[in-house]
Amino acid sequence: LNRYEPIPFQPADGIFPHIHDFFAHIFGEQVELGYDYLQLLYLRPLQRLPVLLLVSDERNTGKTTFLNLLKSIFGGNVTFNTNEDFRSQFNDDWMGKLLICVDEVLLNRREDSERIKNLSTARSYKAEAKGRDRREVEFFGKFVLCSNNERNPVLIEAAETRYWVRRVPPLPYDDQHLLAKMRAEIPGLLFYLQQRMLSSHEES
């Protein structure tokens, strides 16, 4: 069963200065990798991607705004989970999503870490809904986690390569209308992603 929903915007040639500045803020010196990440989400939704973890113990960093921007771009293919949702045995409501976002993540038990790692590379998983039998479904979800806890929001071993961790500084400005401005630029962003060459190459 394919639950993927149409993206709510159509690409159109245009500029996206607010999105570009915001991406530069979130991804810093890795901004081209940030565009790669978004481009793969958009054009190759089945591609396996690392677990993106944005951390900062400071306020007004834009982490939640980043999640809301992803929701604006990908619409119903994005779901917001709590820590409790992620730990629940009932997962049918998010098994078919492209992006599973957790704000204020605190999944620092070993079983949490193992589940995230397994899901980040899984091709299929057992979906379970209340009152229904478990069933195996194709899984292509990617995780975006945000936390104010810089030390141990998720248990990550030293040699682990399935996480992409970014420490996000405070925004240099406070713009209450930033998300609305970026939403208006999404068609231009999508057009750019369709034309853009990836800056990185795929590795297993």
Question: What residue spans do the PLM features occupy?
Answer:
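Conserved Walker B
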Residues: E104-L106, R123, N149-E150
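P-loop NTPase catalytic core of nucleic-acid-dependent motor ATPases
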Residues: L1-C101, S113, W164-R167, L193
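Catalytic acidic motif of RecA-like/P-loop NTPases
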Residues: L106-L107, K117
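Conserved alpha/beta core segments of nucleic-acid transaction machinery
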Residues: Q195-S204
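AAA+/SF3 P-loop NTPase mechanochemical coupling elements
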Residues: F90-M95, E128-C146
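A short helix-turn-beta junction within AAA+ P-loop NTPase domains corresponding to the substrate/partner-engaging
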Residues: P153-Y173
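Short glycine-/polar-rich loops that comprise or flank the Walker A/P-loop
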Residues: M95-L98, F139-K142, A158-W164
